[in-house]
């Protein structure tokens, strides 16, 4: 099937005199997770991971993805004729180098400029120009092959009340216009759906697990417009737009509107697609959108709400842990059935809307695939042995959650116990960090990796990511990683109100996977002659499975942290449990 699709794509390439065609994982808005309409890379390659770029040449094809997906991609690409390129590994070429190496002068590279951000497109152009290669950015060739392509979504919107958001649309627009004045630009083009959702206190369900509407916006010093189908707007949102003089235009009208912009226009090249920038008559000012940082700095209302969302989520996951530990080996269960059980328990919580991403429910060796997704063809039964890794989260009106626990269901090996403890040590060390204001996540990442690096072991992904507020579960700019990646903006200072995940792990192919994840918020600590100190407070409250620990490997300080954390878990979660569940939780949170 994949070979047939690639063959049809090559026929279209020949018709358009294209020798290389790039299929990124993206949509018109540079969204991390895309709706079915934009699942072009998945359709053409069969690889279902959330990140990857497919390059099809006339005689071969290759797919690039990161360390989260090496094992999964190798399995899913087998027999497809598509070579796996493990990004960042020795000897693996960059995408542009691969293209240049395999094409000859005056050949043409094609892609759909609507699904390529400007920064990436200009980087390709720079390399291709040097190699005397042409670039055609107006080709949606996958659309010509994908005959039963789904429709663009157009779900009803809902107004996100200030009771949850903590700031009015009027205030946000005022802040944005003040930024434009300060930077001496006349307008800004916004295409990131999460930024637009934040700015207009607007939510919808266009993308599974990501409560946003596909839309564009242009804001100037005098006016504002949003580009989406007006028929899908709820009454409160329409009133909000009217009160703030926001004009509603058709979704596809953005290209006429951007072409008509005069004066200086601010464009974030990392998010605005290349087709829009190519369409501008005005000279763009390339600069990061200020909304990226503004929405990462949660206000008091957002923090109050998200703390309550995490209590509710903690209740659901703790109830699940009780059920799982009690019933493993006694009743029939599988990866897919326990995943459904967890979703059911979440759905019983007030103001639950949906999961915040597709749950990773991975038993034994499946957990070595960091982002494994259980499907009927891979689903396995769960018994009272080994470990079960579940990475999951919920979208509540009060906020977004993300948690991973590795559950011990029976006997485990000494190797598994050793690495379970080492990974938890890393989690504790980062959780307990005190640091001077001015640090970024890159300064602190070693705390989480240290216990693993001491043994020459690593995990091939970041330690943590920012988390949105009833928005995307992966939110920039804050995060934890050890390596500076120029295309990512993670050098930002960790500031008060930023929420970041903390999720070190160990992954042994063919054997097991372990991950321990909480969300944490940055708070101010003491200020003295050395400066302003900061630290983290946990938002996630679910016990770590003490059945996996080798306590002898923990320092006294680490044991104290874990005991204090578990005491908090019991105090915050037990009031919402049955007497049997609370009694079990007391044991699960026992002092070590």
PLM region spans:
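Active-site neighborhoods and metal-handling regions in enzymes and metal-associated proteins
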Residues: 1-592
């Amino acid at each position: 099937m994949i070979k047939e699709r690639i063959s049809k794509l090559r026929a279209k390439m020949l018709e358009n005199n294209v020798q290389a065609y790039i299929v990124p994982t993206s949509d018109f808005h540079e969204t991390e997770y895309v709706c079915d309409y934009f699942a072009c890379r998945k359709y053409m390659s069969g690889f279902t991971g959330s990140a990857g770029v497919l390059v099809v040449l006339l005689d071969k094809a290759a797919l690039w993805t990161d360390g989260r997906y090496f094992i999964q991609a190798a399995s899913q690409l087998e027999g497809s004729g598509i070579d796996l390129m493990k990004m960042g590994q020795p000897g693996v070429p960059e995408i542009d180098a691969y293209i240049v190496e395999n094409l000859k002068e005056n050949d043409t590279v094609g892609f759909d400029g609507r699904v390529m951000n400007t920064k990436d497109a200009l980087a390709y152009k720079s390399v291709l120009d040097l190699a005397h290669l042409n670039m055609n950015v107006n080709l949606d060739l996958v659309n010509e092959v994908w005959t039963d392509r789904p429709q663009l979504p157009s779900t009803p919107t809902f107004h996100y009340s200030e009771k949850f958001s903590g700031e009015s649309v009027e205030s946000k627009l005022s802040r944005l216009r003040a930024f434009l004045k300060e930077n001496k630009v006349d307008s800004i083009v916004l295409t990131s759906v999460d930024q637009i959702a934040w700015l207009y206190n607007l939510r919808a369900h266009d993308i599974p697990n990501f409560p946003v509407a596909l839309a564009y916006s242009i804001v100037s010093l005098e006016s504002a417009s949003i580009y989406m189908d007006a028929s899908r707007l709820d009454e409160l949102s329409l009133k909000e737009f009217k009160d703030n003089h926001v004009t509603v235009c058709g979704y596809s009208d953005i290209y006429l509107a951007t072409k008509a912009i005069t004066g200086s226009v601010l464009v974030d090249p990392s998010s605005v697609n290349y087709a829009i920038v190519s369409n501008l008559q005005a000279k763009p000012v390339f600069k990061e959108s200020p909304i990226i940082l503004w929405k990462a700095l949660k206000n008091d209302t957002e923090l109050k709400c998200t703390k309550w969302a995490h209590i509710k989520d903690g209740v659901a996951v703790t109830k699940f842990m009780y059920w799982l530990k009690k019933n493993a080996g006694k009743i029939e269960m599988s990866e897919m059935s326990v995943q459904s059980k967890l979703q059911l328990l979440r759905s019983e919580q007030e103001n639950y809307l949906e999961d915040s991403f597709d749950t990773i429910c991975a038993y034994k060796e499946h957990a070595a695939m960091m982002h494994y997704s259980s499907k009927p063809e891979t689903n396995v039964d769960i018994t009272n042995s080994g470990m079960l890794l579940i990475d999951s989260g919920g979208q509540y009106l009060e906020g977004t959650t993300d948690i991973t626990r590795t559950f011990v269901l029976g006997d485990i090996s000494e190797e598994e116990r050793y690495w379970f403890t080492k990974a938890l040590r890393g989690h504790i060390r980062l959780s307990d960090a005190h640091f001077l204001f001015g640090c970024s996540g890159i300064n602190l990442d070693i705390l989480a990796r240290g216990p693993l690096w001491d043994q020459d072991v690593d995990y091939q992904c970041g330690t943590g990511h920012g988390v949105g507020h009833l928005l995307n579960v992966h939110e920039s700019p804050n995060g934890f990683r050890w390596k500076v990646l120029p295309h990512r903006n993670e050098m930002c200072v960790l500031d008060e109100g930023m929420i970041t995940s903390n999720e070190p792990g160990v992954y042994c192919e063919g054997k097991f996977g372990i991950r321990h994840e909480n969300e944490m918020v940055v708070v101010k600590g003491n200020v003295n002659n050395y400066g302003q100190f900061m630290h983290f407070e946990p938002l996630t409250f679910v016990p770590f499975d003490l059945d996996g620990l080798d306590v002898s490997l923990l320092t006294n300080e680490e044991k104290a942290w874990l005991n204090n954390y578990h005491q908090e878990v019991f105090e915050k979660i037990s009031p919402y449990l049955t007497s049997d569940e609370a009694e079990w939780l007391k044991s699960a949170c026992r002092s070590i």
